[in-house]
């Protein structure tokens, strides 16, 4: 069901059994897979490619222009896999250059107020706590847990199954299977 009060471009490719609520905004160069739910006031911008079975909650912006001084208007992409839950007020930027991509894998849970910046690559089955900020060009593995208010500085890498505790800010890589805590970051567990 697509609400007649949603603004959906006729050029957008919308899959089967997609629900788009009133006041959602979907631009021309967008692909939304089957069985997705787009709640009110969501904006899905050009260059966004979304798989199936995703839920996107109110006031989220997907595929926003990158917050990067190097951006010159390239037609870049945001790729979102299948089965993700993207809660309220999340912003995910697309890549800076036309040959780049921001990638969100499958079955991730992004809680309220998360920001994922340009050219970041996120694996699968990760949890991003409230207000977590992932800067540009980061690489996040699989099954990582970010507690609330974590800040990952540009170019950081996080290995599989790491856990980052609330309020941690880091600019160096977090190895797999590590508990990271504090500011500046230190390792435990």
Model segments located where?
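Structural signal for interior beta-strand "rungs" in well-ordered beta-sheet cores
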Residues: 2-181
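Conserved beta-strand-loop-alpha-helix hinge in the C-terminal portion
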Residues: 183-189
């Amino acid at each position: 069901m697509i609400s007649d009060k949603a603004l959906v471009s006729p050029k957008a490719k919308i899959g089967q059994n997609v629900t788009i609520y009133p006041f959602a905004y979907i631009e021309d160069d967008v692909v939304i897979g089957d069985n997705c739910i787009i709640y009110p006031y969501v904006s899905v911008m050009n260059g966004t490619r979304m798989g199936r079975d995703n839920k996107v909650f109110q006031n989220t912006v997907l595929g926003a222009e990158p917050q990067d001084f190097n951006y010159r208007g390239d037609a870049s992409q945001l790729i979102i896999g299948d089965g993700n839950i993207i809660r309220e007020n999340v912003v995910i930027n697309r890549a800076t250059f036309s040959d780049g991509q921001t990638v969100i894998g499958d079955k991730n849970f992004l809680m309220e107020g998360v920001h994922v910046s340009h050219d970041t690559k996120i694996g699968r089955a990760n949890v991003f706590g409230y207000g977590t900020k992932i800067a540009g060009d980061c690489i996040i593995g699989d099954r990582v847990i970010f507690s609330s208010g974590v800040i990952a500085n540009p170019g950081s890498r996080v290995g599989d199954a790491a856990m980052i505790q609330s309020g941690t800010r880091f600019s160096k890589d977090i190895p797999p299977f590590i508990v990271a805590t504090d500011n500046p970051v230190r390792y435990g567990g």
